[in-house]
Amino acid sequence: MANRIKKGDQVVINTGKDKGKQGEVLRVDGDRVIVSNANLIKRHTKPNPQAGVAGGVVEREASIHISNVNIVNPATGKGERVGFKVLEDGRKLRVFRSSGEALDA
């Protein structure tokens, strides 16, 4: 089944500590997404002079389940559900369920 959310989409987070935050999808990995500046975690890294990595505490984004985000509708500015519409030539088109507007051109 095709994903309703793709890399580069603007999304809003529905649940959790970052509820209400908006960001861009950086990566989709199965049923999980990584959203820019959301669900930040700290990782302790060892210094590695060969790779040019300085040690210390590094803050980065962790993944969020795809069911906990909605795509932002540019017309309303709110997160809305997305469905699919099959065209006559067999292509699938992502559409907002509330208005039926096409998400992809």
Curated annotation (Swiss-Prot):
UniProt-listed InterPro entries: KOW, Rib_uL2_dom2, Ribosomal_uL24, Ribosomal_uL24_KOW, Translation_prot_SH3-like_sf
SMART domains according to UniProt: KOW (SM00739)
GO terms for cellular component: ribonucleoprotein complex; ribosome
Keyword Metal-binding attached: no
Keywords carried by this UniProt record: Ribonucleoprotein, Ribosomal protein, RNA-binding, rRNA-binding
Annotated Pfam families: KOW (PF00467), ribosomal_L24 (PF17136)
Domain of life the protein comes from: Bacteria
Biological process, per Gene Ontology: translation
Gene Ontology molecular function terms on file: rRNA binding; structural constituent of ribosome
Complex formation: Part of the 50S ribosomal subunit.
Function: One of two assembly initiator proteins, it binds directly to the 5'-end of the 23S rRNA, where it nucleates assembly of the 50S subunit.
Family under the similarity heading: Belongs to the universal ribosomal protein uL24 family.
Name of the featured protein: Large ribosomal subunit protein uL24
